[in-house]
């Protein structure tokens, strides 16, 4: 039997990258999915966000596996819209069991005292408040099912250690850990488990862009992907520059499956050993 057969999962940031990979992995294991993403570039972060066409492609990939997919165009910062759309989707599919609060952004580097106020607020609003909004919207549906459930919050290696020039990102990702631990305590009596994932660099458009290259090679005027690959490898204990989205999806599948039935409140690195350094 598939590991999440007959369950329904909510995934934010589902247009591409880790979110699409999570959707496909869970569909392969028997879940129907609710896919959330922003359909256009609502923020200026130095690289393009996922598109409506990419979100539709994720849905097609899921449906090609014989599972149902509902697409939601919503910004995780907009609680009212997110609530209405998720309520509608859960009503259609009849239940909610799994949540992957995966939506997030990266940023160009700044020294902490040079971060523009709007850049700081945007980071916290999406990478922390957006995760809380996702949980806030989803938890009542999981509790209504009285079957337990699993919530996985996407943090980062930067949620477990500090990094220079991205304090706004690191602060948001550390905040996700605190939120995860509080939710785990609150929801444990209902057999709802809450954990967080902490990847190192993941090979997606979120890192394959000029802003990230500059973070890892600050002494180079115009760093390239090859420069980034060399610099990124030095940050990991294992001799690799990054992991792939499926590596994170494999960890997520474990956490939401019965294999992890007694794991809650855990911060799980998928980091090639970067938090050891």
Curated annotation (Swiss-Prot):
<comment type="similarity">
    <text>Belongs to the short-chain dehydrogenases/reductases (SDR) family.</text>
</comment>
<comment type="subunit">
    <text>Homotetramer.</text>
</comment>
<dbReference type="Pfam" id="PF00106">
    <property type="entry name" value="adh_short"/>
</dbReference>
<keyword id="KW-0560">Oxidoreductase</keyword>
<keyword id="KW-0520">NAD</keyword>
<protein>
    <recommendedName>
        <fullName>(-)-trans-carveol dehydrogenase</fullName>
        <ecNumber>1.1.1.n4</ecNumber>
    </recommendedName>
</protein>
<dbReference type="InterPro" id="IPR023985">
    <property type="entry name" value="SDR_subfam_1"/>
</dbReference>
<dbReference type="InterPro" id="IPR036291">
    <property type="entry name" value="NAD(P)-bd_dom_sf"/>
</dbReference>
<comment type="pathway">
    <text>Terpene metabolism; limonene degradation.</text>
</comment>
<feature type="binding site">
    <location>
        <begin position="10"/>
        <end position="32"/>
    </location>
    <ligand>
        <name>NAD(+)</name>
    </ligand>
</feature>
<feature type="binding site">
    <location>
        <position position="156"/>
    </location>
    <ligand>
        <name>substrate</name>
    </ligand>
</feature>
<dbReference type="InterPro" id="IPR002347">
    <property type="entry name" value="SDR_fam"/>
</dbReference>
<dbReference type="GO" id="GO:0046251">
    <property type="term" value="P:limonene catabolic process"/>
</dbReference>
<dbReference type="GO" id="GO:0016491">
    <property type="term" value="F:oxidoreductase activity"/>
</dbReference>
<comment type="function">
    <text>Catalyzes the oxidation of carveol to carvone, with a strong stereoselectivity since it efficiently converts only the (6S)-stereoisomers, of which (-)-(4R,6S)-trans-carveol is the better substrate. Displays a broad substrate specificity with a preference for substituted cyclohexanols, and does not catalyze the oxidation of primary or short chain aliphatic secondary alcohols. Is also able, albeit more slowly, to oxidize limonene-1,2-diol into 1-hydroxy-2-oxolimonene.</text>
</comment>
<feature type="active site" description="Proton acceptor">
    <location>
        <position position="169"/>
    </location>
</feature>
<dbReference type="InterPro" id="IPR020904">
    <property type="entry name" value="Sc_DH/Rdtase_CS"/>
</dbReference>
């Amino acid at each position: 039997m598939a590991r999440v057969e007959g369950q329904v999962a909510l995934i934010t940031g589902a247009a591409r990258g880790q979110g699409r990979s999570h959707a496909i992995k869970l569909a392969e294991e028997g879940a129907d999915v609710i896919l959330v993403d922003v359909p256009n570039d609502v923020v200026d972060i130095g690289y393009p966000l996922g598109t409506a066409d990419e979100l539709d492609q994720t849905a097609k990939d899921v449906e090609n596996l014989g599972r149902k997919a509902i697409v939601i165009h919503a910004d995780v910062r907009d609680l009212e819209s997110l609530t209405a759309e998720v309520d509608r989707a859960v009503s259609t599919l009849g239940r909610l069991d799994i949540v992957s609060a995966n939506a997030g952004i990266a940023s160009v580097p700044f020294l902490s005292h040079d971060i523009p106020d709007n850049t700081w607020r945007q980071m916290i609003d999406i990478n922390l408040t957006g995760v809380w909004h996702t949980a806030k919207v989803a938890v009542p549906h999981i509790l209504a099912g009285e079957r337990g459930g699993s919530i996985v919050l996407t943090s980062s290696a930067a949620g477990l250690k500090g990094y220079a020039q991205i304090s706004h990102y690191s602060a948001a990702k550390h905040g996700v850990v605190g939120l995860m631990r509080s939710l785990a305590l609150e929801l444990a009596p209902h057999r709802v488990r809450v954990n967080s994932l902490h990847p190192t660099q993941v090979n997606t458009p979120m890192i394959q862009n000029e802003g990230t290259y500059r973070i890892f090679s600050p002494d180079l005027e115009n760093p390239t992907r090859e420069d980034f690959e060399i610099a990124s490898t030095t940050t990991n204990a294992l001799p690799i520059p990054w992991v792939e989205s499926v590596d994170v999806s494999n960890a997520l599948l474990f956490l939401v499956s019965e294999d992890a039935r007694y794991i809650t409140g855990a911060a799980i690195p998928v980091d090639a050993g970067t938090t050891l350094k």
